[in-house]
Amino acid sequence: MQSSAVFSLSPSLPLLKPRRLSLRHHPITTAASSSDLNVSPNVVSIPSLSRRSWRLASSDSPLRAWSGVPSPISHSLDTNRFRTAATAVPESAEEGDNSGKLTKVLELGLLFAMWYLFNIYFNIYNKQVLKALHAPMTVTLVQFAVGSVLITIMWVLNLYKRPKISGAQLAAILPLAVVHTLGNLFTNMSLGKVSVSFTHTIKAMEPFFSVLLSAMFLGEKPTPWVLGAIVPIVGGVALASISEVSFNWAGFSSAMASNLTNQSRNVLSKKVMVKKDDSLDNITLFSIITLMSLVLMAPVTFFTEGIKFTPSYIQSAGVNVKQIYTKSLIAALCFHAYQQVSYMILARVSPVTHSVGNCVKRVVVIVSSVIFFKTPVSPVNAFGTGIALAGVFLYSRVKGIKPKPKTA
């Protein structure tokens, strides 16, 4: 359209009367591109003026008569305008979805960082307390006691919903509480005898016991992929054990017993089939098990080790009372916190992802303990540990693979 074009009435049309234009509530809308307007060289469509087509007279074109037929070009402009407005909403929604996904990823990353950090602090402070007191039962009892206090506070302040548990549910949970108590006790016994890195290397054997117990009591036949992943785990632990500087049979056997009891808990949870409802999620179940473990552990500790957590006994052992109390409290808080966070992560990711994260956690704990305690590690020991952890990672990836059904 030429810039010299103007609206005019030709003198050769005396009977043509100009029409009065009605511009009520009709703003002229311009599009972002010429393709939306469909502009021809001498025609501009203005949809707001009663959908009529106006001809513009330029210096080289005569004035033509008005047309009363609605312009299809104008209708196309309206359609394009409404289509553009409609597509703006999904774009906003997509931006909101992306923002929500980013928030969830950051939240999950923070939970994983907390999970690893609590594990590092627990193992370091727990090892220091066990090395000073030589009382694994007392230390285990303190950890259950601190956890029970935290659970009680959560329920009293209504920070977490207090469950309504029936007698039948308590009876079903009791075996889980027994093996949970034994598992933590055996872990502390091992940490008191050998290095943190060696204890966690032995605990990498958990998949072996899981496969063994599941086959014995649940009738679950392992796939060739799972059996293939078990081989480097067993071989790596054996290689690390024969080259471990702090090796002793008490520490090795305790760690193995911890593997057996912890995996027995998993098998029992499937065998017993605890009925879960809205009031009995994983965190609530863990809380109930912790309270029951305290009740189970208290009499056994008093009859075997006596009361060894008093200031007088600690002083007689030549240990700083304040340091022992502080480190014991931090270790117990971290012990309870990392298990709570672990269940929070499990509620957000798949079991396979959680297993991979648990494998990485073990690597982080081993490396951090070696650095902190300056544990001597031979090349053979490091190689064996690496092979075992690689096997655990492989197991976590292949255990969900189901064999293809045989076709007739």
Swiss-Prot record:
Stretch forming the signal peptide: none
Q: Please provide one cellular component term from the Gene Ontology annotations of this protein.
A: plastid inner membrane
Location of N-acetylalanine modifications:
A86
Location comes to: Plastid, Chloroplast membrane
- SUPFAM superfamilies registered for this protein in UniProt: Multidrug resistance efflux transporter EmrE
Q: What's this protein's family per the entry?
A: Belongs to the TPT transporter family. PPT (TC 2.A.7.9) subfamily.
Q: Which PANTHER family match?
A: SOLUTE CARRIER FAMILY 35
* Name of the protein in its database record: Phosphoenolpyruvate/phosphate translocator 1, chloroplastic
